[in-house]
Every structure is written in C-alpha cells, then in structure tokens.
C-alpha cells in the first residue's frame, strides 16, 4: 500500500506541529523553515531549505538539500536520495516525520 499521509510524530516533535498530518499528492514536499516550503518548520535545527520528499512510482524518497544539520532516515544520515519505508522515522532537526497509509 502506498503512503497517503505525512505525519509529524506527536511524541518526537516539539511545538504546534506535533501530530500534524499532510495528505500526499504527486508533487514533491519541500521541508524547511522557508515560508514557501510545503511543510514549514519552526525548528531552529532545520535549514531554510532542508529536505525534499518526492514520489517515484509507488515509492517515496527523501533527499537532503545541503542542510547544516543533516537529514536522517531512522538513524542513518541521508547523503543521496533514499527510499523511505512506511513508518520509518525521518529526522529533520528536532522534527520527526513518518509516511503513513
């Protein structure tokens, strides 16, 4: 089953975004502190343009966009675009997101 939602983990994310759910479409999801990001983070450890989630077929991939503090899939630092299994935590600064059905 392909993921349909991007969820910000309630137990892992600080601030007003905890528990937020975003419905995924075909367009990439730009994540960062920039006002024009798809997901705008109020996380001092996130870069202005931190990471991007994009769909390739039925799979979703995350790539770091040259952030200062890195993007992590589970506990591994993302250095190239990497597939994101459903339910696997992606950490951007202090923010943790997961793909959900």
What are these regions (language model features)?
Residues 45-48:
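Short coil-to-beta-strand transition motifs
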Residues 1-42, 54, 91, 96-98:
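Intrinsically disordered, low-complexity acidic Ser/Thr-rich regulatory segments
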Residues 55-57, 66:
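A generic beta-sheet turn/junction motif
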Residues 62-71:
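Short, basic/aromatic beta-hairpin or loop at an interaction surface
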Residues 31, 72-101:
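C-terminal boundary/linker segments immediately following FHA domains
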């Amino acid at each position: 089953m392909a993921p349909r939602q991007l969820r910000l983990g309630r137990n892992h994310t600080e601030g007003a975004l905890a528990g937020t759910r975003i419905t995924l479409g075909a367009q990439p999801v730009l994540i960062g502190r920039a006002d024009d990001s798809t997901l705008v983070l109020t996380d001092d450890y996130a870069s202005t343009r931190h990471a991007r989630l994009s769909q390739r077929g039925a799979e979703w991939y995350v790539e770091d966009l040259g952030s200062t503090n890195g993007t992590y899939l589970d506990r591994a630092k993302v250095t190239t675009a990497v597939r994101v299994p459903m339910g696997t935590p992606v950490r951007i600064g202090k923010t943790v997101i997961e793909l959900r059905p």
